Amino acid sequence: MTKQAKLGGSFTLPGTPIKLVRMGYGAMQLAGPEIWGPPRDVDAAIAVLREAIAAGVNHIDTSDYYGPHVTNQIIKKTLHPYPDDLVIVTKLGARRGEDKSWLHALSRQEPEGNEQYDHASVRDVTI
């Protein structure tokens, strides 16, 4: 079993009862090369997530455009049902092109809006 690490202390989000360890885990590298597609070694990606949680990390930063969709799906597959104190944060509005490009973020004023992307991000990490 992993020894819980000293991760820089913790803080409570203002106005909430949510207490976060200062050191989180950024999930961008769970995706494949160029942050596209699945990782070369899915089992290793799963092991990294499990080790982060075992070390005391209680918040994960992710996004639906990592992969796209890949990191959120790996997080859900690995950690669901989620620990009560785990906080998953995401970014909304950005998109990836079919050519693996990083497209500009959508604004709420654009005709297609963010709704379809926002829903995909939430769908992939929730029950």
Question: Positions of the model-derived regions?
Answer:
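N-terminal binding-site loop/beta-alpha segment at the start of enzyme catalytic domains
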Residues: 1-90, 94-98
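Glycine/proline-rich, positively charged
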Residues: 99-127
